[in-house]
């Protein structure tokens, strides 16, 4: 059974090489690039990826376009800052020999590198995502931000990690989450959602407490604390933005 890897990119020259090399076992690699101004497309092309340039419509739409551009029905979707580990690769290759027959899709545990150390507790782990699936029975859905995959049928569980090297610096993490929060506030408002001050005040505190205390995020040391503080600030900014829109104050 043939397999296509699907990735979307924009200015990922410093990370796309490692991502694509971890996908060398795939029969095809499709990279959909949003007009990068660095060497992303050249690097991808040199590693035998099929590169498609396309204007940016949003995360969900771009990822679904990549899936639809694949030559094979079974697809493995990655972000440019992710890498397939050896264990995960071996699991996928074993599935291929059976034609992926057992399920419509497979979830993988994603583990995030945070300033040189993988986070193994709290809200960051295990971050299970359906990334290997039959595109005839599933695809990308949800908001243009915080998109996800859904399949019609059963979902199996793989155990090898998908490594995530997302944040280049603390400011990068903070700025990215601030941007996501603003986008989500507008998306929620467009869907008719409204909120009061209680969510602005209490939801961030609960998110931090749940991740850092209940889910043992403190075991990741200072990295766990910083990660969950940034996450709590994301929740605060999201609901504050929705509150401002709800009151017509923007």
Give residue spans per PLM region.
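Cell-envelope/extracellular polymer assembly enzymes that use nucleotide-activated donors
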Residues: 2-4
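Short, well-formed alpha-helical segments that are part of the catalytic scaffolds
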Residues: 7-25
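Acidic helix N-cap motif at the loop->helix transition within catalytic regions
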Residues: 17, 38-47, 87-88
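A conserved acidic beta->alpha catalytic loop
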Residues: 22, 33-43, 79
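Conserved beta-strand segments of alpha/beta enzyme cores
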Residues: 28, 50, 154-156
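Conserved donor nucleotide-binding strand/loop of the catalytic core
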Residues: 41-69
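Catalytic-site signature of metal-activated, phosphate-bearing donor transferases
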Residues: 64-67, 73-74, 78, 85-250
């Amino acid at each position: 059974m043939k397999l296509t890897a699907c990735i979307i990119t924009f200015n990922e020259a410093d990370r796309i090489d490692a991502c694509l090399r971890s996908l060398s076992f795939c029969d095809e690699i499709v990279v959909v690039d949003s007009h990068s101004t660095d060497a992303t497309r050249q690097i991808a092309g040199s590693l035998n990826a099929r590169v498609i340039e396309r204007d940016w419509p949003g995360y969900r739409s771009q990822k679904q376009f990549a899936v639809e551009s694949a030559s094979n029905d079974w697809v493995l979707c990655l972000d440019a800052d992710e890498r397939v580990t050896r264990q995960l690769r071996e699991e996928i290759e074993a599935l291929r020999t059976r034609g992926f027959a057992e399920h419509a899709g497979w979830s993988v545990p994603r583990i995030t590198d945070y300033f040189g150390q993988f986070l193994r507790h709290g809200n960051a782990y295990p971050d299970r995502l359906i990334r290997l699936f039959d595109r005839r029975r599933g695809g990308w859905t949800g908001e243009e931000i915080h998109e996800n995959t859904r399949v019609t049928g059963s979902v199996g569980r793989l155990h090898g990690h998908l490594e995530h090297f997302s944040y280049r610096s603390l400011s990068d993490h903070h700025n990215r989450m601030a941007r996501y929060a603003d986008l989500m506030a507008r998306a929620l408002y467009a869907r008719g959602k409204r909120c009061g001050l209680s969510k602005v005040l209490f939801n961030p505190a609960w998110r931090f407490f749940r991740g850092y205390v209940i889910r043992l995020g403190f075991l990741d040391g200072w990295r766990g604390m910083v990660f969950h503080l940034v996450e709590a600030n994301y929740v605060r900014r999201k609901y504050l933005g929705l509150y401002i829109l709800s009151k017509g104050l923007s």
